[in-house]
Amino acid sequence: VQAMQEGLGESFVGTSNCSIAMKRDIEAIGTNAHELPMVYSALADSDEDLAMAPYQVLADWHEEHDGNLRIILPDTYGTEGFLKNAPDWLASWTGMRIDSGDPKASAKNAIKWWRSLGENPKEKLLIFSDGLDVNQILELHKQFSDEVNVSFGWGTNLTNDFRNLADGGRLDAFSLVCKAASANGRATVKLSDNPNKATGPVSEIKRYRRVFQVLSLIHISEPTRPR
């Protein structure tokens, strides 16, 4: 973070690490994590409650946070269905984070969603955060910066961009994230916009696919571990 402050200057706008933000007196910016809707969903007692769980998370969050902490993370159970069924008040939030799937398609869908609800995308913030490198950042900025405010959650390839420098990918970065495995004895599930990121027991993944109308995970046949 210190290196980013010194190297990027005003282009470095904050960190999602609240401890570092407090110690360095910089902006805490980002989203709540996938764990929250995963836990709320695991605690749901019916399919109806399950379908509403991701929005209940944000309703509770709305009561406690504002400004740059009101960033929607829509992909826990598929962005398309999330936006289709989202309450209108959610469009008033500061922005949206794109963390899986095709970032360009997701950005276009976010802009379209805001416009459909009477919001001006030029007053909104899109945060791209899925395995970015410099070339992707430049390309996304060039394509979308005239339509919406763009920012980039740059982590994995920021601290380790040594790809193809050792045989067998021994220096390549790897993804290390924390996910809730269960809540009150019930397994948690994450679907994502990327089928490779799906986690949870197969039986529960099938149920969540049905409830959230996600069709991309039909070929999953083995239990997956949280990641």
What are these regions (language model features)?
Residues 147-163:
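Glycine-rich phosphate-binding active-site loops on the catalytic face of alpha/beta enzymes
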Residues 218-227:
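Single conserved hydrophobic/aromatic residue that forms the stacking wall/gate
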Residues 27-29, 69-71, 94-97, 123-127, ...:
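Structural preference for beta-strand elements that scaffold enzyme active sites
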Residues 1-109, 114, 144, 182-186:
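Buried, small/hydrophobic-residue-enriched core segments of structured protein domains
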Residues 116-121, 146-148:
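Short helix-capping segments at alpha-helix termini
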